[in-house]
């Protein structure tokens, strides 16, 4: 689904002070940002239209969404507790480690089984993110999936 040209993200920046991670994690970050900017639905509730820039960071163990317009006007800052994400992210890390090992040496059926589990946990995290942003930011599921990937990248780095 192509989103309205104004109800979308045009730029996403992750907190660079946390540093870099493994090549696999950095690849996940790059792909998520590329896919997110290609197609997304992102509408801060109560704001007439973007496109928007998102600065995503971790501050004092909280997830911070700083949103501005493409022109730089601040729109909103939303701060979310990480508590609802901790178990999901931990499970996701563990299954991703298994997945990265499997793609190097496992059979296709083993890789597929691990990937199905990975996708299921990723979907759970994406839905949790949508629920936590409900009433603050309207997004579609694909946008939530890509944003959840970036939340995981911040965890990995932090």
UniProtKB/Swiss-Prot annotation:
It comes from the Bacteria. InterPro entries: UCP032146 (IPR008321). Disulfide bonds: none annotated. HAMAP family: UPF0262 (MF_00678). Belongs to the UPF0262 family. This is UPF0262 protein R00612. It comes from Rhizobium meliloti (strain 1021). The lineage of its organism: Bacteria, Pseudomonadati, Pseudomonadota, Alphaproteobacteria, Hyphomicrobiales.
């Amino acid at each position: 689904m192509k989103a309205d040209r104004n109800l979308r993200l045009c730029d996403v920046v992750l907190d660079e002070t946390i540093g870099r991670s493994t090549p696999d994690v950095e690849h996940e970050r790059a792909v998520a940002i590329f896919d997110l900017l290609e197609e997304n639905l992102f509408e801060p509730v109560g704001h007439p239209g973007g496109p928007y820039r998102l600065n995503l960071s971790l501050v004092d163990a909280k997830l911070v969404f700083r949103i501005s317009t493409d022109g730089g006007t601040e729109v909103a800052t939303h701060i979310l507790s990480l508590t609802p994400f901790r178990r999901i992210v931990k499970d996701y890390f563990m299954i991703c480690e298994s997945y990265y090992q499997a793609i190097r040496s496992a059979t296709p059926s083993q890789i597929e089984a691990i990937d199905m589990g990975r996708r299921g946990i990723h979907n759970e995290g994406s839905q949790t993110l949508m629920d936590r942003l409900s009433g603050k930011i309207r997004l579609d599921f694909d946008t939530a999936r890509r944003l959840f990937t970036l939340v995981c990248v911040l965890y990995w780095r932090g």
